[in-house]
């Protein structure tokens, strides 16, 4: 399904989810900052980038862990926190605040039925030495790749293709093992990621990084950039960005005020089913 066909309704829904997340965090004294394209949207467009299709936030690890605990005990009404700890089909190691009155399947290869969502990325303390922080990112990425591999559902035909060539027998064996032992392997990988995420004391750390982010080494940056945050108008509400947002955004994107070429202004999610109306 093409998001452009339902863009107005889509944006209204994810904006409502963002407002719900804000209310939850204000009620419990938690902090988050808009990040990536959402942060650019706040500065450059004062709202969702016209061709963007999601909202992303980062949350300091201590607050993120508290949010996970709060979600176990508190009813968020029509919203739910989707995490890798309570949904075996969920293939990611960050969380989403999801609207239960909506439905989507984000990927065909790793299908997980949830509602429309806001992505919540944990922001972890990391090594003060940048090179060591980068090596930690590399190690973490390898674990994520393994989690992705065991979460991918292959069709029968794809399995047979692997079996018919001696060059792919090894991959067939790994896929078969993953099929029968997926839950155990998944739990082990998540424990490894949990361990790495808590290696350093967040309060004492000089640098932080989003291990689950997709911008490579750029995900490592000085914690002092966050500060107390800076408020920006965002559609019909306001959002918080890192206090030194200009340094933060230039670190990730260079001249972020420059519009990308027209051919790059496209939605990025691979969606196979969408239902955004309340039943």
Regions found by a protein language model. Give the residues of each.
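Active-site nucleotide-donor binding segment shared across nucleotidyl transfer reactions
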Residues: 22-55, 59-65, 224, 251-252
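Cytochrome P450 catalytic domain signature, combining two hallmark sequence patches
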Residues: 74-79, 254-262
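Internal, conserved structured core segments that host functional sites
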Residues: 82-148
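Metal-dependent nucleotidyltransferase catalytic core
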Residues: 14-17, 58-97
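Residue-level detector of conserved catalytic or cofactor/ligand-binding positions
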Residues: 272-279
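Helical scaffold of the NTase/Pol beta-like nucleotidyltransferase catalytic core
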Residues: 1-35
């Amino acid at each position: 399904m093409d998001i452009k066909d339902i863009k107005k309704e889509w944006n209204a829904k994810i904006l409502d989810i963002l407002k719900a997340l804000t209310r939850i965090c204000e009620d419990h004294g938690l902090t988050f900052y808009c990040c990536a394209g959402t942060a650019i949207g706040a500065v450059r467009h004062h709202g969702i980038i016209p061709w963007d299709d999601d909202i992303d936030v980062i949350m300091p690890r201590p607050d993120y862990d508290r949010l996970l605990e709060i979600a176990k005990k508190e009813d968020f009404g029509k919203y739910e926190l989707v995490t890798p700890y309570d949904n075996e089909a969920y293939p990611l190691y960050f969380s989403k605040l999801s609207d239960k009155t909506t439905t989507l399947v984000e990927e065909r290869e790793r299908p997980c039925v949830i509602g429309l969502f806001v992505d919540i990325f944990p922001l972890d303390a990391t090594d003060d030495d940048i090179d060591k922080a980068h090596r930690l990112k590399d190690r973490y990425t390898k674990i994520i790749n393994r989690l992705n591999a065991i979460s991918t559902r292959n069709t029968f035909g794809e399995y047979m293709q692997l079996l018919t060539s001696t060059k792919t027998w090894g991959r067939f064996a790994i896929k078969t093992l993953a099929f029968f032992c997926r839950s155990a392997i998944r739990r082990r990988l998540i424990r490894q990621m949990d361990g790495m995420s808590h290696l350093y004391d967040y309060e004492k750390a000089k640098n932080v990084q989003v291990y689950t982010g997709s911008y490579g080494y750029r995900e490592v940056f000085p914690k002092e950039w966050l500060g107390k945050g800076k408020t920006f108008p965002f559609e019909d509400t306001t959002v918080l960005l890192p206090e030194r947002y200009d340094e933060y955004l230039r670190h990730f994107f260079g001249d972020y005020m420059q519009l990308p070429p027209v051919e790059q202004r496209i939605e990025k999610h691979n969606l196979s089913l969408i239902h955004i109306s309340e039943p």
